[in-house]
């Protein structure tokens, strides 16, 4: 996978995606999430790949093991670069996801969502009824993902250093919640700058609105890219 900032294509239509991608004359690493995939379907993935871009298909699969395994068999045929599941589904579910993926695809990396970067300590305790710190909850889910054989996790940059210490440098830490200095926090709570994410051990960063909603997306992307790749 490219070591580039992953741009979250948080658009509702293929037309808006193409308008955005047409601004760039270089190969990108982009994220297609539920909103866009459910609107446009697999054909959009094929078109983005044909343009030479890497794709993170962010569907966060979470169901019984058999269902997730079968779903991953279908997604494997899209030949994206990165897919994910929810670690809360457990080791068996994650193992079945890998089996389904590998039936048709040996190259796609698979990672697990630990805790969303919108999660707060209060939400963790009172809504999820998890009576530990966010850091401990993330570590527990990351250990389950590692035990299942996944390539890494989605986590906040604030947990990256801990996960590197516990699970090694090759374990992927894909981190949303990235905001350049002075940018709006939006609905993210556990955030850092690109430079801080690199220093903390993130292997990849995901950036959406600071690029896609910028007055000059190309310039904003290059600034984030430069600060990430220092």
UniProtKB/Swiss-Prot annotation:
Coiled coil: none annotated. The keyword Lyase applies. Gene3D superfamilies: Aldolase class I. One of its GO terms (molecular function) is orotidine-5'-phosphate decarboxylase activity. SUPFAM superfamilies: Ribulose-phoshate binding barrel. Its EC number is 4.1.1.23. The active site is at residue 60. Keywords: Decarboxylase, Lyase, Pyrimidine biosynthesis. Catalyzes the decarboxylation of orotidine 5'-monophosphate (OMP) to uridine 5'-monophosphate (UMP). This is Orotidine 5'-phosphate decarboxylase. It catalyses: orotidine 5'-phosphate + H(+) = UMP + CO2. PANTHER family: OROTIDINE 5'-PHOSPHATE DECARBOXYLASE (PTHR32119:SF2). The gene is pyrF. Belongs to the OMP decarboxylase family. Type 1 subfamily. Substrate binds at residues 10, 31, 58-67, 117, 179, 188, 208-209. It is an enzyme of class 4 (lyase). It comes from Staphylococcus aureus (strain NCTC 8325 / PS 47). One of its GO terms (biological process) is 'de novo' pyrimidine nucleobase biosynthetic process.
């Amino acid at each position: 996978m490219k070591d580039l900032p992953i741009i979250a294509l948080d658009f509702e239509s293929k037309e808006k995606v193409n308008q955005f991608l047409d601004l760039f004359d270089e190969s990108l690493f982009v994220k297609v999430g539920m909103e866009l995939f459910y609107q446009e379907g697999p054909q959009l993935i094929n078109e983005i790949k044909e343009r030479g871009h890497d794709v993170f298909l962010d569907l966060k699969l979470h169901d019984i093991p058999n269902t997730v395994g079968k779903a991953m068999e279908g997604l494997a045929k899209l030949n994206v670069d990165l897919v994910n599941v929810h670690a809360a589904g457990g080791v068996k579910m994650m193992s079945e996801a890998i089996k389904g993926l590998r039936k048709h695809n040996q190259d796609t990396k698979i990672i697990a969502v630990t805790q969303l970067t919108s999660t707060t300590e209060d939400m963790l305790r009172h809504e999820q009824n998890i009576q530990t710190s966010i850091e401990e909850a993330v570590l527990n889910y990351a250990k389950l993902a590692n035990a299942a054989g996944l390539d890494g996790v989605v986590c906040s940059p604030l947990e990256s250093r801990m996960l590197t210490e516990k699970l090694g440098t090759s374990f992927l830490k894909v981190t949303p919640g990235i905001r350049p200095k002075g940018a709006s926090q939006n609905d993210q709570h556990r955030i850092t700058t690109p430079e801080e994410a690199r220093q903390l051990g993130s292997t990849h960063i995901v950036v959406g609105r600071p690029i896609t909603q910028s007055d000059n997306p190309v310039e904003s992307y290059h600034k984030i890219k430069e600060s990430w790749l220092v």
